[in-house]
């Protein structure tokens, strides 16, 4: 295939970034004109900008890429993790007007314009990252308009950065109705149907969509799972009517403590001991349902190079991370065992209920983008469902 370099013409317009602490950056706008507010976080990934931008977990946030050149390989239709960009805005040092890759179908510039995303470029992202690392994540404001009063801007930022005004972000990104995701799985929906080719049981997994990424669903279907994806506020009673083999609690945005409806359902599932696997927000929700506490981190974990240690085997895996909240290590309930910790800050990365078929992981084992080290956790979930299923069969016999 002929290697082609494609260049997009850009019309540069001045843009301004204002942080909650009063710091001001002046740069150029390469997205749509307008203004946006959001919590500013930084992501240290060098690749995978398309997957990051389309991750629903970034809802209500403004993403800062620490890597200086973004957009070099363009955009393709297959690597989006959701249908739209949920982030409120984007901050970069430079968006390349030249893109080249055999899979690319359009430029990042055009994609951002089509998605109506406000972007500021040509600012010192290293300086911004150092500020966020020191002060913690801050609310901020990006505008292409002339600012007449910084004081009024800061007042509005302070209003938005108030827990009382924060909305339930999960319900904004969750599906509104049940749907089936059955890629690569036998089309028949029956818990006792086996895949004729693989001679294995098809596992019916109910996925709670708190902001689920497409590749998570693919990882499960690749392991012979038939998926029913459901709204975040679905009751346990409705779920149990469709006879799942296991429950998957997905990633998602915001503070898990606002998802009381999910906690009610998880507690019901724990009571009957159905297999549960939670990641990211789902990990935090399982911890809350088990009696643990959640705290907000200073600037969170956002990147694809985070080392995590598995305590049982003493091995290290490099993982993809995207979260601003973590499970509090103080006063953990006795029914929870810590399975993984971060080698960056010692925070909890994995939990296992010692009295139930339930476990969770703070990172993103689907690795989109990121390393594949933690994909084995999906296999662990399959083994857990097999164990539960075999136990039920023995009871019936």
Swiss-Prot record:
InterPro entries: Anth_synth/Amidotransfase, CarbamoylP_synth_ssu, CarbamoylP_synth_ssu_N, CarbP_synth_ssu_N_sf, Class_I_gatase-like, CPSase_GATase1, GATASE. The keyword Lyase does not apply. Residues 1-204 are annotated as: CPSase. GO terms for molecular function: ATP binding; carbamoyl-phosphate synthase (glutamine-hydrolyzing) activity; glutaminase activity. Belongs to the CarA family. Small subunit of the glutamine-dependent carbamoyl phosphate synthetase (CPSase). CPSase catalyzes the formation of carbamoyl phosphate from the ammonia moiety of glutamine, carbonate, and phosphate donated by ATP, constituting the first step of 2 biosynthetic pathways, one leading to arginine and/or urea and the other to pyrimidine nucleotides. The small subunit (glutamine amidotransferase) binds and cleaves glutamine to supply the large subunit with the substrate ammonia. This is Carbamoyl phosphate synthase small chain. It comes from Buchnera aphidicola subsp. Baizongia pistaciae (strain Bp). The gene is carA.
